[in-house]
Amino acid sequence: MSFQEQQITFDSRHHQLTNINVWTPDSQWLVYDVRPNGGSFTGLTIEKIHAKTKQQQIIYTATQGAHVGVATISPVAPVRYAFIHGPENPDDLWHYDFHHRRGVIVNEQEDLGAVN
């Protein structure tokens, strides 16, 4: 069996895939974070794209100066997205580090926003 490689995104942004759990349980959607500047932790959205239709959806948008990234999906239903969330209203001394962030979960079934 041979596989043919396919490009599924074409816009000029950095679509950052985590190295594990990026497919929805039905294997139809890929989740990623969008980083305007390569590997920097400066993304504002967590998004997903349908592998066949190329339809894109924003799952979460950070507000108040916060940044988000490193998105993963629960491998079993219900679909839940987990990702790193930086602080709202960071000061000039803030930099990306393990003690300057939190993990959050967004449940696709409910519109509750991000839950710590």
Give short role names for the model-derived ranges:
Residues M1-N116:
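Sequence signature of WD/YWTD-type beta-propeller architectures
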